[in-house]
């Protein structure tokens, strides 16, 4: 099972708690898991495993997560702070599922849709509308895998996820080669969206 939205950053990050906890939470944003609880309970009841989608993505990650005071209009933090927030967020999510529901999460989409020729920089790393790129830089995806490997138990396999991969296979492989060589990534996921109205025979 894979949740469409319930385990994406904007569903798990807790703005109010992050703000009220300052300065303690400045480098450690708060999370909550209310949105994904129905899916978790369904999976447990029906003996299903969950794929965690997704930890680091340019979309559906609120702007306040990247700002000094966790407000929507605040100034963006610098690279050092955002790397610490990334690490803390990944730790919080992975440790929650490992301690509360050990064995439930079989795979984690650590980074989603980071490479895009049309909306990327000169190296194809997505730059447009990407606050990860703006705050951390063009290597943000690598650091996400470093953190994920640090906190993920062995039963959670770590993936890069994307769509339309046929047109950017070489780009993806080039950028993920270091992570692969260092044992930080287990595979590449290729997503699709099907509805009950789709004719899967054609």
Segments and roles (model prediction):
Residues 120-122, 144, 166-182, 199-202:
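Distinct, well-ordered alpha-helical segments
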Residues 150, 154-159, 177-182, 187-202:
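Substrate-binding and catalytic surfaces of secreted/luminal carbohydrate-active proteins
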Residues 2-18, 23-159, 163-165:
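Substrate-binding cleft and catalytic face of glycoside hydrolase catalytic domains
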